[in-house]
Amino acid sequence: MADAWEEIRRLAADFQRAQFAESTQRLSERNCIEIVNKLISQKQLEVVHTLDGKEYITPAQISKEMRDELHVRGGRVNIVDLQQVINVDLTHIESRVSDIIKSEKHVQMVLGQLIDENYLDQLSEEVNDKLQESGQVTVSELCKAYDLPGDFLTQALTQRLGRIINGHLDLDNRGVIFTEAFVARHKARIRGLFSAITRPTPVNSLVSKYGFQEQLLYSVLEDLVSTGRLRGTVVGGRQDKAVFVPDIYSRTQSTWVDSFFRQNGYLEFDALSRLGIPDAVNYIKKRYKNTQLLFLKATCVGQGLVDQVEASVEEAISSGTWVDISPLLPSSLSVEDAAMLLQQVMRPFGKLASAIVFSDTVVVSEKFITDCTGLFSERMHQKAEKEMKNNPVHLITEEDLKQISILESVNTSKKDKKDERRKKATEGSGSVRGGGGGNAREYKIKKTKKKGRKDEDSDDESQSSHGGKKKPDITFMFQDEIEDCLRKHIQDAPEEFISELAEYLIKPLNKMYLEVVRSVFMSSTSASGTGRKRTIKDLQEEVSNLYNNIRLFEKGMKYFADDTQTALTKHLLKTVCTDITNLMFNFLASDFLMAVEEPAAITSDIRKKILSKLTEETKVALTKLHNSLNEKSIEDFLSCLDSATEACDIMVKKGDKKRERQILFQHRQALCEQLKVTEDPALILHLTAVLLFQLSTHSMLHAPGRCVPQIIAFLHSKIPEDQHTLLVKYQGLVVKQLVSQNKKTGQGEDPSSDELDKEQHDVTNATRKELQELSLSIKDLVLKSRKSSVTEE
């Protein structure tokens, strides 16, 4: 109730004051705004709108409020925060900041912040507290803690060192502040640690292991080394690879190097590197600058070792022997260094040194090499004479003949090849195998290949067929053979040296062998030329005989079926036709001194080699003749033979009836004489069948053994039944004997087949006995009929 009366009395008093108050004039808010804007536009009033537009504030008031806010915030305030507090546009704040900085020297602008000296003093006090606590502080850590730039902070702290901050700045690294106690403590640790080191130690490893400040460590270490407190050197400067080398280690190191060099006469760069010497070459040059040394790739050699090698080389050259310098050198020297050393030793000899280096370390005198070639002299003559007899076609090539002085007169006259060949043929040509060729044999020459054969020693005959130039196909010995011979005469020689020496000797030995072959060939040619050569008349007679034989053999083949004719044709081409071809090739080979004693020894490869030396006109005809031997037609062969004889100026006498009868008689006589003396059942059957064929058909037949059954089958209607039955029975026994022999060969020495062997033996004996009983009867089929028959001549 009392409160209500109190409120009534207060309202009555306010009413009374209002009755007695004087009335005044008031401007509206709009009029006030217009008046202020007019004053601002006339520059009679300088005020700034607040951001909400409700107040005006003067620049002086802005500056005052900024100073107040800076003081309130401890001397550091961001201008963005000032703009929010004062509530004016940021441009007005920035314009007043520049005025404050100009008027007040203790205030500065850093990264959009106002900072005064009071704040920096306070910051320095905090830094000093941290410094005294830890002994060191880094500017980088302070930058992160106080969000200030490093240069500004370094400058501010430097000004307060000794005044507020009790410490000093590292001169080498201005980003660290130390206390004297910290430096002294670390200096003592560094001094103690490095005093205990006795071998080269990387400084960087100590920094990480013991937690040293890197720049402080290098500064203290250099100071201790320069003052002599630490005995040693820092190699590598202030880098990650810096190494502290104590003097005691350097002295021990130098003592070891001197001792090793004095005892061994050389130094290994790797060994010095393992001792902790990074640049071994420069170390050696500095330490032994007055000593004569030879620097190799991985070692350094003293003059004593060089003189020892030089003396051994000189002795080997003067005595005509060889020397391997490897045993004279330390085992640790590489082959490359040994080769470089030997090269330096050989240099003073210059062109006067008649020696060759093998395997990088073996010095061989020219006299020793000459002696080695002399080891093969006798073998050269033996091989040349042997090869000369066997196959001279492989020994002398066309290029070799150009170098033989005795043939120069022949090479100068090349006007007419046919005339020249005819002239030589009248003097004589190579002898050939005589006879009618009825049972000519086949010859095969097997080629062997040596494992040590070199490319330059091989003769690819395909090159000659393509007309390409090639090296002489003359090889004395292959490398492995030469090595075997050298091992017998050179004792205790390294295998590599033997191999290289053999390879080196191949060419000179082949060259010497070529000269020996020429000498043997020419002497053999001159000594036996008269006996070896045959006249053109003898050749024409022999070619004519073989030609007529082929014609008669072809006539006899026509009695058989086509498949049998094919087999007979192949056999005839392989034997008699090949013989007549070889006769002609051997005759042409005499132009090149390539004729052989026995034309039957000429193979297809030798014919190709002879073809490569013929003139184009002769070569075409002889090539067709050579190729026709691989065909299946006797007519084609005879056609090619006619062309070949015409190209070679060989006249062939074609046979007439009388001549054919003579050939038939002579052929039968030769077969009968062979039948009389032979005891081989298979050959008896073969000869009897061929003779019965000739007696019944009056035609010659040249047949292989596999065609005998067909001949016997043909004779079934040509001879009496009893004779044919006897012939068939004898054929069965021959086949049985051959089968038995093949079984015995295939079984070998199998113990489980003893019983079978016994039975087989009994059967074989019975067969052989029966064949012996019938052989005479089989021979009589021909020999008795020959006595009773009419003479064919």
Curated annotation (Swiss-Prot):
Residue numbers of Phosphothreonine PTMs: 535
Localization (cell): Endoplasmic reticulum membrane; Cytoplasm, Cytosol; Nucleus; Chromosome
Chain positions covered by the region annotation Mediates interaction with TRIP4: 200-400
Region of interest: Required for E3 UFM1-protein ligase activity: 2-212
Record EC number: 2.3.2.-
Tissue spec: Ubiquitously expressed with higher expression in pancreatic islets and other secretory tissues. In the embryonic brain at 17 dpc, detected in Sox2-positive neural stem cells and in Slc1a3/GLAST-positive radial glia. In perinatal brain, highly expressed in Slc1a3-positive Bergmann glia of the cerebellum. Continues to be expressed in Bergmann glia of adult brain at 16 weeks. Expressed in adult heart. Highly expressed in the intestinal exocrine cells.
Entries under InterPro entries matching the protein: Ufl1, Ufl1-like_C, Ufl1_dom, Ufl1_N
Region (Involved in CDK5RAP3-binding) location: 121-250
Gene Ontology molecular function: any one: UFM1 ligase activity
Gene Ontology annotations of biological process type: DNA damage checkpoint signaling; DNA damage response; DNA repair; erythrocyte differentiation; hematopoietic stem cell differentiation; negative regulation of IRE1-mediated unfolded protein response; negative regulation of NF-kappaB transcription factor activity; negative regulation of protein ubiquitination
Processing after translation: Ubiquitinated, leading to its degradation by the proteasome. Interaction with CDK5RAP3 protects both proteins against ubiquitination and degradation via the proteasome.
Keyword DNA damage in annotation: yes
Pfam families, alphabetized: E3_UFM1_ligase (PF09743), UFL1 (PF23659), UFL1_C (PF25041)
Residues recorded as bearing N-acetylalanine in the entry: 2
Induction: Up-regulated in hypertrophic hearts (at protein level).
Membership in a protein family: Belongs to the UFL1 family.
Subunit structure: Catalytic component of the UFM1 ribosome E3 ligase (UREL) complex, composed of UFL1, DDRGK1 and CDK5RAP3. Interacts with E2-like enzyme UFC1. Interacts with RELA. Interacts with NBN; promoting recruitment to double-strand breaks following DNA damage. Interacts (when phosphorylated) with YWHAG/14-3-3-gamma; sequestering UFL1 and preventing its association with PDCD1/PD-1 substrate.
Full protein name: E3 UFM1-protein ligase 1
